[in-house]
Amino acid sequence: MMKNILAIQSHVVYGHAGNSAAEFPMRRLGANVWPLNTVQFSNHTQYGKWTGCVMPPSHLTEIVQGIAAIDKLHTCDAVLSGYLGSAEQGEHILGIVRQVKAANPQAKYFCDPVMGHPEKGCIVAPGVAEFHVRHGLPASDIIAPNLVELEILCEHPVNNVEEAVLAARELIAQGPQIVLVKHLARAGYSRDRFEMLLVTADEAWHISRPLVDFGMRQPVGVGDVTSGLLLVKLLQGATLQEALEHVTAAVYEIMVTTKAMQEYELQVVAAQDRIAKPEHYFSATKL
């Protein structure tokens, strides 16, 4: 059975971020994606200038009411949320999650708690971080913070892998069943590897891959692709280990392709065959 995912996050017309990054790779793995855009911008914000608008929160609810009106909401297997244009949008998304789960009690909510990194040029609206801590976290079935977001969610510093596993379990105690720490950064085992953790109440998996050096300008949308692909693999019945290994390899293939083409925007179309069947393999370790 094809899985249907309502993906509520940002959209850029040029390039790849949010839905514009994740939607195609998710489809390439065999999922139906229903993109619902929280913002429509000309390009991602790390260029330093952009045009476009943030969608009114009511717009998100209206679109989903339209899907409910044609009696298709019960076919939705998961809601994925990413970059929010405002905290109020977040409240509407939680209303949508409740509506989807009422129509399909098996549906999952995957929250990618994008909180912004001003030094990276990723800007989020006031109140969004607080929304994720108070409301997004307890409502989610799966949550995917990076290290900075993990520290904000658990409200204390995280300095190494062991502390990251414990912090993830603190989050699990508040609602989600699965936590993906999608970039361990300085808390990882090695400074020259890209490392992730996938944690449940009784399992923890660690994986690492080589860093791909883009110099000063790291491509945007890597986390969006990572979250989207992990959700697809889990919905398709992959184990935690299988999902983590495939996603790590697929994202690495995109990064390597992007670097080889000397591009700044993720080359998801050029890498499409290796997203579905990665040529590299990275082994996850059970902690």
From Swiss-Prot:
GO molecular function: ATP binding; magnesium ion binding; pyridoxal kinase activity
Binding annotation for substrate: 10, 45-46, 224
Pathway listed: Cofactor metabolism; pyridoxal 5'-phosphate salvage; pyridoxal 5'-phosphate from pyridoxal: step 1/1
Enzyme class at the top of the EC tree: transferase
Binding site for ATP: 112, 144, 149, 182, 209-212
Keywords of the record: ATP-binding, Kinase, Magnesium, Nucleotide-binding, Transferase
Pfam families the record matches: Phos_pyr_kin
SUPFAM superfamilies: Ribokinase-like
Family designation: Belongs to the pyridoxine kinase family. PdxY subfamily.
Protein name in UniProt: Pyridoxal kinase PdxY
Phylogenetic classification of the source organism: Bacteria, Pseudomonadati, Pseudomonadota, Gammaproteobacteria, Enterobacterales
Primary gene name: pdxY
